[in-house]
Amino acid sequence: MSEILILHNSRWGKSRATLQLLRDSNIEPIIINYLLSVPSIDELRSISKKLNLHPSRWIRKSEKDYKNNNLGKYLNDEVKLYDAMIKYPKIIERPIVIKGDKAIIGRPPENVFTLIK
């Protein structure tokens, strides 16, 4: 089986629940605290491709950083969105679970089963 990574924030219930589902399935993923180890622009592009989503679809529009910095004006500009994700990593949707060339957002946490089945 390919290694599994999780972009994780232990402060958030969905992230903890997704991690627990992986562990309950006897999978110990590589845990990346994306707030401390912020993905590079190349990593963000790769994640976007693996999710098969434009970055505007996996940012948290309800986050303070998103609202306070008027980031909505960049929804059609991938580079500016990636730059914003690097500068304000809290706007990155979480958790993101990656396996090989596929990734899912663990909202709801059970989405992880589509990746590990």
List each model region and its residues.
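Local sequence-structure signature of Cys/Sec-based thiol-disulfide redox active-site neighborhoods
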Residues: M1-S25, P29-Y34
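Thiol/selenol-based redox catalytic cores and closely related redox-interacting motifs
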Residues: L36-K117
